[in-house]
Amino acid sequence: GLLYWSGILAMGAMSVSIILAMRLKFLEPWLGGLDKMYRLHKWLGITGLVVSIIHWFAKQAPMWFASVDAVRPARPAAPEQTNAILAFFQTMHGPAEGIGNPAFYALIGLVVLALLRWFPYKYFFKTHRLLAIVYLALVFHSLVLMKFTYWGAILGPVMAILMALGTIGAMISILRGIGRINRAAGEVTGFEYHPGVKVLRIDAKLTSQWPGHQAG
């Protein structure tokens, strides 16, 4: 139904967005360079947020209707499970559902902040990293609540790979490791502000090699 598919699409978009944020060199030629990778990262993040809102409405709407006696959502008792893995996942449904709403609200706030042009970059740099923590919470939410039958189809392994790679990317972000191997040392030798286009030009002299960069 809409609830499950919106959740899958949202997590898929967010996972790919985080994978792109890792700045994997081999992806740059395929995606047209780092600037286009980040543009895709941005729009996948926005897509993940929009579909997450749809997912949230799909979850809340039946309860809203039930509150006015328009419809009563069926809540059949879950059958007792003999599969040990499935039984464990069922015991985790409560915590997984409980973490969903706070993570969703945090996602909205952090993505909106990231899109505000007037929000200072020095704060954006710090708050944007919090999205990695939110993502990890949503991975737990998704792993536990995704339909067990999906794991037997191609969808399950695909989502597992995406979320595993996304989790690695989130952990690298939390540990401030993104782009570390590509950093170069240098000193600013001059700068010029262009008010017409609101661009600051900076001249820099490198004091170390810039991995992967070729002048010209």
Predicted regions and their residues:
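FNR-like FAD-binding dehydrogenase module
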Residues: 1-216
